[in-house]
Amino acid sequence: MKILVTGHLGFIGSHVYEHFIQQGHQVDGYDIPHDLGDFKTEKKYDLVVHLAANAAIREAIENPDAFWENNVTKSIPIFEYCRKNNVRCLYASSASVYEWWINAYGITKKVNEIQAPPNSVGMRFFNVYAEKVSRSDMLYRMLEDKTATYLTRHKRDWVHVKDIVSAIALLAESDYTGVLDVGTANPVAVIDLATKMGMGHLPIKEETPGERDITCADITELQKLGWSPTINILDTVK
């Protein structure tokens, strides 16, 4: 296949890009220094994997206009290319859409699901992580780097980037359209993960406004396609 991966220099995008190359596909990447808002091409791709986005919540608070520009406005040329050329599109959504009104990131991902062309799949990623990667899930990274200062009683659905890649690879070959969750359906308590990583001694913060007590993916649709996660976060840490 001829595949375009946006955000191919990012955390998830770099893994997806390398996977498709290793599988023998013709793969183009589109990322910094290019501007998605200026995206134009005469090439005919078989698949677009749109992973370019800004997930920095602090920036969303400090500069919401720029955040909207990056995640919503600059997605328009990508989606329009797919719509006009009837190209299948897999795009990054987020578990944040389930309470999209809480922060600007969730809002932009909810809008992406509305923007997306008919022949597309919105992938609602949960807490994506990988060992020793600076752009991994923030809480996981803080525990790994020993920089966390407190814990919470929350449970989170941490999904390894390798499982994300395998889900995307499967969806690339399927004819599924719509939106679906990509996670493990096996949430792990922050306290349990911290204890396994030698950080269980930290104080517990009881009040965390705006955060869900538990996140848990419903992976029924992916399981119907033959996918299941293979990595449990508690098995990857020491």
Model-identified regions with their sequence ranges:
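N-terminal Rossmann NAD(P)H-binding glycine-rich loop of SDR-like oxidoreductase domains
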Residues: 3-22
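C-terminal "lid/loop" region of Rossmann-like NAD(P)-dependent oxidoreductases
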Residues: 151-153, 179-180, 188-195, 199-219
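Amphipathic terminal alpha-helices
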Residues: 232-238
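Adenosine-cofactor binding site in Rossmann-like domains, unifying the SAM/SAH pocket
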Residues: 26-41
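NAD(P)H-binding glycine-rich loop region in Rossmannoid oxidoreductase-like domains
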Residues: 40-70, 99
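NAD(P)-dependent short-chain dehydrogenase/reductase
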Residues: 102-106, 110, 114-170, 196-197
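Conserved Rossmann-fold NAD(P)-dependent oxidoreductase catalytic core, especially the SDR/UDP-sugar
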Residues: 76-106, 121
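NAD(P)-cofactor binding segment of oxidoreductase domains
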Residues: 48, 62-89
